[in-house]
């Protein structure tokens, strides 16, 4: 394990840059923090270990043939985004996902703004085996440290695609997806009455504005979760959980 003792080290400077979106985009890499990520099979590029915990996770660290560096607490804090860190930071490469290999069931996220919501939805999609997630360019960066933390490792198990809205519409139409919009409307069906087709794409919208008109206008059906009081609406992550689990139930998978 390589020991780095200076925060002026080139690698440390590079790792600090990965805390910014523009560098994550340019390098195709991102940071994840916490030893739980080492339970996944995805091979890291680099593992950074705080020196005081180096003996706690030897078994996990030995699973991977990759660059490992040992740093003191001061340098580690320069890289960490957590107050009570477990002392492990991992550098992963983003997946090179193929739009030509999409599954028959897609989740579309339209301008989701809150990192916690996005991370929770990614974790949910992993749990319900909706592995392909298409995000509009207005959606928060999925490799943001808060999103990564909320995914609890599920970021490693899903395929993410950031596209312009018109690109998404073209993709769905050309590939004959049944487009289901979660949208409050007189014509909207309760979520448990939806008829699924061979290929389905369900769209969840921005926390404040909901789904954009472009998606509403091209949808094949609209669905709602009935509200039994005067509550205005449900949190988008909660709504996603209810609907995606119901769809898997309709398919007979749970």
Residue ranges of predicted features:
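Boundary-proximal intrinsically disordered activation/regulatory segments immediately upstream
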Residues: 1-55, 139-140
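Short acidic-hydrophobic, aromatic-tinged amphipathic segments that line or gate anion-handling sites
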Residues: 3-6, 68-72, 159-166
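Short, aromatic/basic amphipathic alpha-helical patches
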Residues: 55-64, 215
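Glycine/small-residue-rich loop that forms an oxyanion/phosphate-binding "nest" at active or ligand-binding sites
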Residues: 68-92
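Short beta->alpha connector loops at strand-helix junctions that form conserved
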Residues: 71-72, 110, 136-137, 159, ...
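Structured adenosyl-cofactor binding patch, chiefly the S-adenosyl-L-methionine
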Residues: 87-90, 127-128, 147-153, 213-254
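RNA substrate-binding interface of SAM-dependent RNA methyltransferases
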Residues: 99-187
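Active-site/ligand-binding-proximal alpha/beta "capping" segment
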Residues: 181-231
């Amino acid at each position: 394990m390589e020991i780095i003792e200076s925060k002026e080290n080139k690698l440390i400077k590079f790792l600090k840059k990965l805390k910014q979106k523009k560098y994550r985009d340019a390098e195709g890499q991102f940071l994840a923090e916490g030893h739980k990520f080492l339970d996944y099979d995805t091979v890291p590029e680099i593992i950074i270990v705080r020196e005081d915990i180096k003996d706690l996770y030897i078994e996990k660290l030995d699973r991977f043939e990759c660059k490992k560096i040992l740093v003191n607490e001061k340098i580690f804090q320069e890289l960490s985004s957590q107050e009570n860190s477990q002392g492990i930071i991992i550098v992963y490469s983003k997946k090179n996902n193929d739009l030509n290999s999409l599954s028959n069931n897609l989740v579309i996220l339209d301008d989701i703004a809150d990192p916690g919501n996005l991370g929770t939805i990614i974790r949910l999609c992993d749990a319900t085996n909706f592995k392909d997630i298409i995000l509009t360019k207005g959606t928060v960066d999925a490799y943001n440290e808060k999103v990564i933390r909320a995914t609890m490792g599920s970021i490693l198990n899903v395929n993410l695609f950031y596209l312009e809205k018109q690109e998404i519409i073209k993709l769905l139409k050309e590939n004959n997806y049944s487009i289901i919009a979660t949208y409050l409307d007189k014509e909207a069906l309760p979520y448990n009455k939806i008829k699924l087709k061979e290929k389905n794409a369900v769209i969840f919208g921005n926390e404040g504005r909901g789904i954009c008109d472009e998606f509403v206008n091209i949808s094949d059906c609209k669905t709602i979760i009935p509200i039994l009081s005067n509550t205005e609406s449900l949190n988008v992550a909660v709504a996603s959980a209810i609907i995606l689990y119901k769809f898997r139930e309709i398919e007979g998978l749970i």
